[in-house]
Amino acid sequence: MKYTFTSLFLLLFLGAFSQVDLLDELSKDQKPKREYVAYTFKTTRVINGHSIETVKKNQLDFRVSHRFGDIAGSPNDHIHSFFGFDQAADIAIIFEYGITDDLTVGIGRMKGAGPLRELWNANLKYRVLKQTKDFKFPITITLFGNTTISSMRSSADITSVNYFPKGYTGFSHRLSYTLQALMAVKATDWLSVQLSPTFVWRNNVPYGDKNGMFFLGLSARAKFSKRIGMIFEYFLPVIKPRVGGREYFPMVRGIKNAAYYPNLHIGFEFETGGHVFHVNFTNSRGLLENDFLPYNTANWAQGQFRLGFTISRSFPLSFKDKPKEDRKYWKKGSVEDEK
């Protein structure tokens, strides 16, 4: 009996040991699940420029943007224009739809602030790579492109940028394009930084100017809470200092009243019940990359900056196949509560 009990004990011990050993082997074979960062930026825009964010699958993002006039651009003019509130530098209405979580298409209508007005825009955005939480892949990369056409009446002045002759040539003169490779890192839970190499092509430009221009954008977001953050943008042309009589770096060269100034934007974002609200100050009069990047003539140092706002809201077009946490968001909370 003693030997039987001893044998039984040894069998149970060896069986338990082999089971633990087998579980260890199985755990080694299972690869750890890769986790990606979420909400590097709150919405698909930082301020004027696009962020690496895309619209979620089967959701429609609707946004309205408004830029007022100069706060203090001319002596005493700020009194008569009530610090720019009586004026509208640009207005935009935009719809964007998420075909997948990584692919977004959009259309929009902008008033326009450059020589071409009444701008109709179509864009495509695809997120190629995502940043992982363990930083094994440290950045998110999104590709963006748009096509813009002006529907404004043709000028009678044949030397004007907005002179559109009849036929294909006139139609072509109305078009412009933007391409971007957006690269961002969510460095911490509260800080995100983005680089935006940008190429803008205009089919028709003022005499001596360049059709194609490169820009480099730097954007950042500092999150104070799940619903409040500070946002920043700066776009600088990658070009010779002087092209066709136009100075592209007037501040460095000590030139006043130049025909171009880099774009500097700063603002705050607030989220309330599913709406994301941006309040910002910019020296850009336009809202579209094709418009504000090549045509900005406003100088912060001369009071030529303006108050602006953007309000955006995403609507789920279908709750089918949506995870429960997404459904909870539409009832209450922040878009970042679920992460």
Question: Where in the sequence are the language-model features?
Answer:
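N-terminal signal peptide c-region/cleavage motif recognized by signal peptidases
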Residues: F13-G15
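Transmembrane beta-barrel domains of Gram-negative outer membranes and organellar outer membranes
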Residues: Q19-A156, S160-Y168, L175-L179, V185-L191, ...
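Positively charged n-region of N-terminal signal peptides that target proteins for export
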Residues: M1-F5
